[in-house]
Design a protein with these regions (language model features):
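Short acidic capping loops at alpha-helix termini that bridge into adjacent secondary structure
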Residues: 2-7
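Acidic, Mg2+-coordinating phosphoryl-transfer loop and its flanking beta/alpha structural elements
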Residues: 8-48
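Short, structured coil segments at secondary-structure junctions
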Residues: 22, 42-43, 75, 121, ...
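Short, well-ordered alpha-helix to beta-strand connector turns
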Residues: 23, 44, 98-99, 138, ...
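N-terminal active-site beta-alpha-beta segment that forms phosphate/nucleotide-binding
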Residues: 65-142
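Conserved phosphate- and dinucleotide-binding cores of soluble alpha/beta proteins
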Residues: 140-255
Length: 255
């Protein structure tokens, strides 16, 4: 599901145009001379924020958005792709304007600037502040995911389980906001990413006393601090929701 076209990597508008002239795929690096917005407007097909983020592109190429969109939409999910955070923010803030919104704990959402990015017309609730009817039945539940499969599944692991609960039942609409680093070839690799990439990073961030926080891999431990208490795999939208969608952003975000 990835293109085999050669990549042209650069850090300027001239580089992006140089790539486009012979029909190459342009990858903009954001640690150079130009901002993400300038690179995108100059024709960048993808952006990377660190040198380490280049490795998946070397191994697999740029994602074929149309194929991934089809994988999710044939399962009934909504799907929208934005090249950059700056492109995605207006869609998210406009969608949530005038609505009640609950947010799941997410490094991706924090990197996007939420909840501060919302307008004053949006009633926002962080799910760890208080529980109750507002959290359970908002107009929109905004979350991220530990992994997305290119075959159209969404994978999340949770400790308190209030985050995955909000993606399964109660809200009228659920939006998963994810960076390209969350994409995996299939369901098996998506589960592996959730267990051996996202969970260890979160355990370390939260200073949990678990083996994965030390060596970065899942031991299926029984530690009291274990944050892998439940796993949710969305194979399609919950029947009770009006809409469940994926917003994919062409930049690495979160864990």
């Amino acid at each position: 599901m990835f293109r085999a076209n050669p990549l042209y990597i650069g850090d300027s508008a001239t580089d992006m145009q140089t790539a486009k002239n012979p029909g190459l795929l342009a990858v903009g690096v954001t640690w150079g001379f130009r901002s993400a917005e300038e690179l995108t407007s100059s024709g960048a097909d993808a952006l990377v924020n660190t040198p380490a983020d280049l490795l998946p592109l070397f191994e697999r190429g740029l994602l074929a958005v149309d194929a991934i969109c089809k994988a999710f939409t044939k399962r009934g999910f909504g799907f929208t792709y934005f090249p950059t955070v700056a492109d995605a923010l207006p869609y998210l803030t406009d969608t949530c304007a005038g609505k009640s919104v609950s947010l799941g704990g997410s490094m991706t959402l924090k990197e996007l600037g939420f909840p501060e990015a919302f307008s004053n017309s949006t009633a926002v609730h962080w799910h760890w502040v208080r529980t109750g009817e507002f959290f359970q039945t908002p107009d929109i539940y905004l979350s991220s995911a530990n992994a997305l499969s290119e075959t159209g599944e969404v994978v999340n692991i949770d400790g308190a389980c209030n985050r995955i609960a909000g993606t399964l039942f109660g809200p009228k609409r659920c939006i998963f906001v994810c960076g390209i680093n969350k994409l995996c070839p299939d369901l098996e690799s998506a589960i592996d990413r959730a267990r051996n990439v996202a969970a260890p990073l979160n355990a370390k961030r939260l200073k949990k006393k678990t083996p994965c926080a030390v060596d970065g891999k899942c031991h299926d431990c029984q530690s009291p601090d274990r944050i892998c208490r439940a796993m949710a795999i969305h194979m399609g939208p919950p029947q009770s929701m009006e809409r469940c969608e994926i917003v994919l952003i062409g930049q690495p975000l979160g864990y």
